[in-house]
Every structure is written in C-alpha cells, then in structure tokens.
C-alpha cells in the first residue's frame, strides 16, 4: 500500500512536472513570439524612418539642382538676349547710316546728271571749234599756194628753193597754231575731266569712309608684376622654350617694366601666341602641359574670330552667299599687312568704291563690290602656296566657282593681263584710289629716295632741261628749262615727253604731276 502510494505520488509529480514544462514552453513560446514581433516592428519602423529621411534628402537635392539649373538657364538667356539686342542695335545703326548715305547719293546723282548735260554741250562746242580750225587750215593752205607762186616770180628762185622756204614757214606757223590750240583744248578738257572725276570720286567715297591703320610685326603683353617674368621663363627656361616652339613666335623679355614683346612676321601666329600668354598670365598656372591647353583654346578662339571677320565683311558689303571656306580665307586678310595697310580693310574700301563707281555708270553694283572684296584674296595664302597673290587669287576664285567677272578683276587688277569687263576696270581704279591716297601705304626710306632720284634723272636727261626738283613726296616733278633752247609753245611737248618717260620707267600706283617752267630774264648794266 505504502509502495503504491509513493509510486502514485511520483507519477503525479512527474505528470505535474511535465505539465508545468509544457505550460512553461507554451508560455515561453508566446512570450518569445511577442517580443520578437515587437523587435521586428521596431526595426521596420526604424527602416521606414531612414527611408523617409533618404527620400526627403533626395527631394531636397532635386529641388536644389532644379533651382541651380533655373538660375543658369536664366543667366544664359539674359546673356543671349543681351547679345541679340546688341547685334540688333548694330544692324539698325548700319541700316540707318546706309539710308542716310543713299539719300545723299540720290541728291548728288541729280547734280551729276546736270554736269553731264553741261559736258555734252561743251563737247559740241569743241567739235564746232575743230571744224572752224580745219576750215582755217584750208584757207591758210590756199594763201600759201598763192604766196608760193608770187615768190617764184618775184625772187627768181627755183621751185625747189621756194618749196623749202615755204615748207619751213608753213611748218613753223602750223606748229605754233596747233600747239596753241592743243594747249587751249587740253586745259578745257582737263578742267571738265577734273570736275567730273572729282564728282564721281566724291560721290563714291562719301558712301564709304574706312580707316586704314598700319600694324607692326610685334605685339606687347602686359603682366601684373616682374615676378611673372620668371614664371614665364620657368626652370632652366623650359616654359619660354615650350611657348616659342609651340607658337612659332619669339618672346622678347628685356628690362621693360611689366611687358613682354612677341615678335613674328606671321600676324596670325602672333595673335594666337598673345592670347595664349594672356590666358596663362591670368590663370597663374604656367607649365608645358598647361601651355599646350592654353594654345589649343587660343587657336580655336582665333579661328572663330577669323570666321567672324569674314562673315562681317560679306555682310556689310551685301554680296550675297559666299562659300564657307572662302569666308575663312577672307577673314585671314584681317591679319595680312601689305605696305603697312590692313588688306581686309583695304579690300572693303575697294569693294565700296568699286560698287559706287559701278552704280554711277549703270553697271552691276553688287557684282562690283564682290569683285572688289575678293581682288586681293590671294594674299591670305601667298605664304602657303607658290605663285603671286594674283595667280593664287585666280585659283581660289575658280575653285569656289566665282563668276567670270570676279576672276577677271582678280587677274587684271595689277595689269598682269588686259581686263575683259567693265567690272575689272572699276576694281583696278578703286584699288589704285585706295592704295595711292595719302597715308594709305608706307614705303621704306630707301625706296622713297630711289624713286625721287629716278624722277629727277629722267627729267634732267630731257633735251633743254636746266634742272629739276622732285617735290610733294614724289607726287610732283618741277622742271626748269633753258629759255634759249625751248620756246614757250614747246614746253608742253617737253612736259609730255617727260610724262611718257616716267610712265615707261617708273612703277607707281598714283599720279605724278609734271610741271615745266620757262623763265626769261633780261639783264643790262648801267654805267654811272
């Protein structure tokens, strides 16, 4: 009994223990699940909070980027609008000036027409005078024949002797009368031609008044201080050597304060080198790799500037469509100097003068401007290609299919060949006007002295000349003749002889005035 009791008691205890364990396990499981679920929810909440922060941060960044983009777009738009406004104002100013000049041109055209009518009437008077002179010559011949018969009868001369006397008297008398008539008509023709030529040129030049500025073979770059010179030279001169090798320009660094001189015969290379050096000085970082980067940037900038200059020249001359490559070649003329004259400005001046002259005589004004603008196009490449600038210009114009009148003007503007069109003649005249006007071009002192000496030599070699003087910078030669060798009416023949010899022996773009002076002095000594 007692054993059963303990057994039963043990079984119950074990059952209770098992039950307690099971209950504890269940309770532990639920507690574990509860706390684990709470931790998961906390982690999820933390993750959601972080996600919201990230989204908020991204939104803020996006808003900031949008604000910056809007600011940049607004700034760029303002710059573009300002640039457009400036260009529009420039175009409006040019059109306004052009309209005013056209008004003045129309008024002057009416005046010119009246002068032409007056010139026609003068021409009729000259023709009438010529007929009268021919009639007088016939009458003189009749009188001479009568005198011949009388001389043969009275002087008992042979016919040959009388003929010689009469021929000499007739020749002298006719020469005197013809020289007097030539002098009178020449003065009248010169007066009328001078008035008409001045009117034409004034009308043409009033439409265009361009400045020609001589340029040198050096450029000067200003630097902020003397220490910058050392940085430009670099360690053992590596920076300055790199600059000179890459740009092809000589850098001259001397004792001149805060300046560096760039020397080169090629103005385009010199301009690129100048911009490169200015960029390096402003940037402050000067070393070989930086020099290469600055050179690349400056080259692109100068190329763009050349294109802009070509486009501007084509625009202001209103010549129509031009091949893009020809535009670039035209822009290079801005950096080309001939006799200290900027070739692009010279070409613009020739274009406007040729155009106005063409309009005066009823020719194609636009075609004349186009031919004038391109007449020196070969000078842009004459240092890159073989041949004269005329030959190169003809090749370029033919390559880009310019009209035959333009090609003819290029080929004949230096009289290398005879002009085949009126346009070519007008371009040659405009070229002479532009290059020969005072101050347009400069020549060396040596050439200047040689030309003056040659003028005086030609004059002194003429028969009957006592002495001569070249004055007005070689634009006039004054000749004094011996009065006992040259008669009054023969000084015109002397002037013409000297003029023809000058035209034959001297090459000069312009007009040289020949003035012949004959002076007779009578001296008597009174004894007291």
From Swiss-Prot:
Entry's transmembrane regions: 15-35
Subcellular location: Cell membrane
PANTHER family: RIBONUCLEASE Y (PTHR12826:SF15)
Pfam families: HD (PF01966), KH_1 (PF00013), RNase_Y_N (PF12072)
Domain HD: 343-436
Membrane topology: Single-pass membrane protein
Enzyme class: hydrolase
GO cellular component, one term: plasma membrane
Gene: rny
Tagged with keyword NAD: no
Domain of life: Bacteria
GO molecular function: RNA binding; RNA endonuclease activity
Chief location bin: membrane
Name of the molecule in the record: Ribonuclease Y
Keyword RNA-binding: yes
GO biological process: mRNA catabolic process
Known role: Endoribonuclease that initiates mRNA decay.
Chain ranges of the KH domain: 217-277
EC number from the UniProt entry: 3.1.-.-
